[in-house]
């Protein structure tokens, strides 16, 4: 019998909603990256986009361990000389909590061509409301670990 290789049309995609309230940022990012890649599916293949859609709500209430809010810096560059901007993680979470989660989840994904297609299935919201109720997303629970 020959080995079965899944095609992108053979994959049925589910919708998951994750509540980020008091969940550690790195743990949330690894679970979301695994869902986006489809690592838990029996049809997983690393060369096929077989991941699911992930909705993350309450991104502004994500937990950051130790003193990383004040210590860790975020950098971006405008492309012009002297255009390096820096901001602490805490300030970045105040201004753009969605962007912080998107960057951390993208960093947990493999750096190849499939990542761009997988990240398009990530939907992050700072509040508890999202416009994807018609897709009937399942809740995905992340176990809390004692800190």
From Swiss-Prot:
One of its GO terms (biological process) is negative regulation of translation. InterPro entries: Ribosomal_uL13 (IPR005822), Ribosomal_uL13_bac-type (IPR005823), Ribosomal_uL13_sf (IPR036899). One of its GO terms (cellular component) is cytosolic large ribosomal subunit. The keyword Transcription regulation does not apply. Keywords: Ribonucleoprotein, Ribosomal protein. GO terms for molecular function: mRNA binding; structural constituent of ribosome. Signal peptide: none annotated. Gene3D superfamilies: Ribosomal protein L13. SUPFAM superfamilies: Ribosomal protein L13. It comes from the Bacteria. NCBIfam families: rplM_bact. Part of the 50S ribosomal subunit. This protein is one of the early assembly proteins of the 50S ribosomal subunit, although it is not seen to bind rRNA by itself. It is important during the early stages of 50S assembly. HAMAP family: Ribosomal_uL13. Belongs to the universal ribosomal protein uL13 family. This is Large ribosomal subunit protein uL13.
